[in-house]
UniProtKB/Swiss-Prot annotation:
Residues annotated to bind ATP: G109, G111, R112, K132, D144, G145, R195, R202, D281
InterPro entries: SelO
GO molecular function, one term: magnesium ion binding
Its EC number(s): 2.7.7.-, 2.7.7.108
Stated name of the protein: Protein nucleotidyltransferase YdiU
Active site feature: D271 (proton acceptor)
Record's function text: Nucleotidyltransferase involved in the post-translational modification of proteins. It can catalyze the addition of adenosine monophosphate (AMP) or uridine monophosphate (UMP) to a protein, resulting in modifications known as AMPylation and UMPylation.
Catalytic activity annotation: L-seryl-[protein] + ATP = 3-O-(5'-adenylyl)-L-seryl-[protein] + diphosphate; L-threonyl-[protein] + ATP = 3-O-(5'-adenylyl)-L-threonyl-[protein] + diphosphate; L-tyrosyl-[protein] + ATP = O-(5'-adenylyl)-L-tyrosyl-[protein] + diphosphate; L-histidyl-[protein] + UTP = N(tele)-(5'-uridylyl)-L-histidyl-[protein] + diphosphate
Entry keyword set: ATP-binding, Magnesium, Manganese, Metal-binding, Nucleotide-binding, Nucleotidyltransferase, Transferase
Residues the entry annotates as binding Mg(2+): N272, D281
EC supergroup of this enzyme: transferase
Organism: Burkholderia ambifaria (strain ATCC BAA-244 / DSM 16087 / CCUG 44356 / LMG 19182 / AMMD) (Burkholderia cepacia (strain AMMD))
Similarity comment text for this entry: Belongs to the SELO family.
Length: 522
């Protein structure tokens, strides 16, 4: 899996593909030095086969239309080299640390992920390719370094679904399966998912060098991130404080978008927080079905730390962890000779930045909810109206996605058209009371029902990756039928379109879906 254009380094069976993938090595992160990563080959995955491939991501990377049909494709993205790995092309696993479920976990790192190369995108950006499930690394701890088919399909589907919802995310290029057994809560089979992102740097990377008292390496990492992804920060009075602010604001925006579509991440540890404000590390995630503000999507989260309603608070807390890690760098430009005085000012400056999180998150979520309700004009009580709807949904366990989608059918003047959304509520009197408030608010709007409905349908998805939809695709894939993975991926590429031929994918979950559980055991 060399990404070199050299014929000597290319896989014999993949001359055209190797040339396409070609080139500039492993990217800028690997040049930071050995303190940041370990170079090693992937562990071969026996008899790999293609489960799914995103044509859109392939196009983003400039890969040909025939990319996924070339001989050796599965071998390449399973991490199986057909000859010895050239030293300059060895993949790498990066080291980081972090807080897990609010507790300092110490050194972590890419325990089953290997970055295999970097390619220029057709959008002018550069993208790292990382295989998840490529075998043990020095950071695997007690793990086997493998990913399972179940979690790999879920990550593949949700990465692309989130992108098409307009939510910042890592992307997914391929899923490669194998019949190799692995032990989790039960015996499962191995798989590798290829993730694509401008960067996989996490809050935990900064925490690692802070906790190891290596301000020199911390600064090297921060400079890398600033120069490559936040160049405007270099022009600020304090580039490292500006980096903290940029990451904090992006994180606030991201979580506001999560809340607006009912997405629960499930494992918001600091090592799962992207410095670029991307959704990263799709594990026991879930979209809320019957709305419960206390919804916990991760079976392993017994305390509810990462419940739906907690996500904004946890994201803010994680930004505090990032701020602590950056403190040794903040204020260096001020030339304060006294270390204690500089540290005190750094804390004050960081606190001021962190105070901007709620200032950013609140209005961002209000804008999103106003759009979901089809409100073009801004009114003081709009947040109260939205919150009252959520409270009513919570009390009736109304379906999150369908409630907002069907609200578009409600008329300003005719309550007889309320049935499609009203029927989602157990307490219909409570819904009627809210609907009366909503109509009063709509009377202040200038758009007619049709224009409002069209606007609402552009922001309220009809199709999201519900757990039971993923489960059906996974069960069929286990029988070597990958058609449902492809079909579901196609539906989720157009989440806001009606797609009448796929109406079943927008239905309420079946009764058996209530017994599904997802956990960290992927």
């Amino acid at each position: 899996m060399s990404f070199s254009r050299s014929a000597a380094d290319a896989a014999d069976t993949l001359p055209d593909l190797a040339a396409t993938l070609g080139a500039p090595a492993l990217g800028a992160f690997v040049t930071l030095g050995d303190a940041f990563h370990t170079r090693l080959p992937a562990a071969p995955l026996p008899a790999p086969y293609v489960v799914g491939c995103s044509d859109e991501v392939a196009q983003l990377l400039g890969l040909p239309a025939s990319f996924a049909t070339q001989p050796g494709f599965a071998e390449l993205f399973a991490g199986n080299p057909t000859r010895d790995w050239p030293a300059h092309a060895l993949p790498y696993a990066s080291v980081y640390s972090g807080h897990q479920f609010g507790v300092w976990a110490g050194q972590l790192g890419d325990g089953r992920a290997l970055t295999i190369g970097e390619l220029p995108g057709t959008d002018g950006r550069r993208y790292e390719l990382q295989i998840k499930g490529g075998g043990r690394t020095p950071y695997s701890r007690m793990g086997d370094g493998r990913a399972v088919l179940r979690s790999s399909i879920r990550e593949f589907l949700c990465s692309e679904a989130m992108h098409h919802l307009g939510i910042p995310t890592t992307r997914a290029l391929t899923v490669i399966g194998s019949d190799q057994p692995v032990v989790r809560e039960e015996i499962e089979t191995s798989a590798v998912v290829t993730r694509v992102s401008e960067s996989f740097v996490r809050f935990g990377h900064f925490e690692h060098f802070f906790s190891n008292d290596r301000p020199d390496l911390l600064r090297q990492l921060a400079d890398h991130v600033i120069d490559r992804f936040y160049p405007a920060c270099r022009e600020a009075d304090d580039p490292y404080l500006a980096l903290l602010e940029a990451a904090t604001l992006r994180t606030a925006d991201l979580v506001a978008q999560w809340q607006a579509v009912g997405f629960c991440h499930g494992v918001m540890n600091t090592d799962n927080m992207s410095i670029l404000g991307l959704t990263i590390d799709y594990g026991p995630f879930g979209f809320v079905d019957a709305f419960d503000a206390n919804h916990i999507c991760n079976h392993s989260d017994t305390s509810g730390r990462y419940a739906y309603r907690m996500q904004p608070r946890i994201a803010h807390w994680n930004c505090y962890c990032l701020a602590q890690a950056l403190l040794p760098l903040i204020g260096l430009q001020h030339g304060i000779a006294d270390d204690d005085a500089r540290a005190e000012r750094a804390v004050d400056d960081a606190q001021a930045v962190l105070a901007k999180f709620p200032e950013r998150f609140g209005p961002a979520l209000e804008r999103a909810m106003r759009a979901k309700l089809g409100l073009e004009l801004e009114r003081e009580n709009d947040a109260e109206l939205a919150n009252k709807l959520l409270e009513t949904m919570h009390a009736s366990h109304a379906d999150f996605t369908l409630t907002f989608r069907r609200l578009a059918q409600l008329s300003k003047h005719d309550a007889s058209r309320d049935a499609p959304v009203r029927d989602l509520f157990i307490d219909r009197d409570a819904f009627d009371a809210w609907a009366n408030l909503y109509r009063e608010r709509l009377s202040e709007e200038t758009r007619d029902d049709a224009a409002r409905a069209a606007a609402m349908n552009r922001v309220n998805p009809k199709y999201v990756l519900r757990n039971h939809l993923a489960e059906v695709a996974i069960r069929r894939a286990k029988e070597k039928d990958f058609s449902e993975v492809e079909r579901l991926a196609q539906v989720l590429r157009r989440p806001f379109d009606e797609q009448p031929e796929h109406e079943a994918y927008a239905a309420l979950p079946p009764d058996w879906a209530g017994s599904l559980e997802v956990s960290c055991s992927s």
